[in-house]
A protein has these predicted regions:
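Short, Lys/Arg-rich, polar N-terminal cytosolic tail immediately upstream
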Residues: 1-4
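Transmembrane-helix motifs of polytopic, lipid-linked glycan transferases
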Residues: 76-100, 104-108, 138
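Alpha-helical membrane-inserting segments
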Residues: 59, 63, 85-89, 140-143
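Extracytoplasmic catalytic/substrate-binding loops of multi-pass membrane glycan-assembly enzymes
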Residues: 21-39, 46-59
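Membrane-interface micro-motifs in multi-pass membrane enzymes
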Residues: 53, 105-144
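Membrane-embedded transmembrane-helix bundle of lipid-linked glycan/lipid transferases
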Residues: 7-15, 78-84, 141
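Short hydrophobic/aromatic helix or loop-helix immediately within or flanking a transmembrane segment
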Residues: 46-82
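Transmembrane signal-anchor helices characteristic of membrane glycosylation enzymes that use polyprenol
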Residues: 6-30, 107
Length: 144
């Protein structure tokens, strides 16, 4: 197996493990996430009594009710965002993927702390904002 392929696999596996660890480290917030995890949050979502973000609220309810799902969903989404960005930017040129993947990771990890807290440090915010960005990137990839 060529050295470039091994390096690419190592970087991908390492970043997946890193993002799963980050997802495991995200606590539930007392003001919002706990409410989504209780029966009241489920009633809110089923009744459509909130903000109209039905898909995002669905992810918030599921991630707040099941901690293992939270870790997997957040970790995989955090990993897939730079992965899909790099796939889109590489435009099929395999040699460009790894540098682009590292640059996309750097861009995400170096975002301002206030933005990081709202998107990655808040489970309900993650379900509403980051998951939708992932679906948008997947849609762009399908259109390409």
């Amino acid at each position: 197996m060529p050295r470039q392929v091994l390096l690419r696999r190592f970087v991908l596996v390492f970043s997946l493990i890193f993002y799963l660890f980050l997802a495991l480290s995200v606590p539930y917030s007392a003001t919002d996430d706990w409410l989504w995890g209780m029966e009241e949050g489920l009633r809110w979502w089923l009744g459509g009594m909130l903000n109209g973000r039905y898909a995002g609220n669905f992810f918030a309810v599921v991630m707040c009710r099941f901690p293992a799902v939270k870790v997997l969903a957040m970790g995989l989404t955090m990993f897939l965002l730079p992965f899909l960005m790099a796939l889109l930017a590489a435009r099929g040129e395999e040699r460009r993927f790894l540098p682009l993947f590292l640059a996309c990771n750097a861009g995400i990890l170096l975002m301002p702390p206030a933005m990081w807290q709202e998107n990655y440090g808040w489970v309900s915010g993650f379900g509403n904002y980051v998951v939708s960005a992932l679906f948008f990137l997947a849609w762009l990839l399908l259109l390409r």
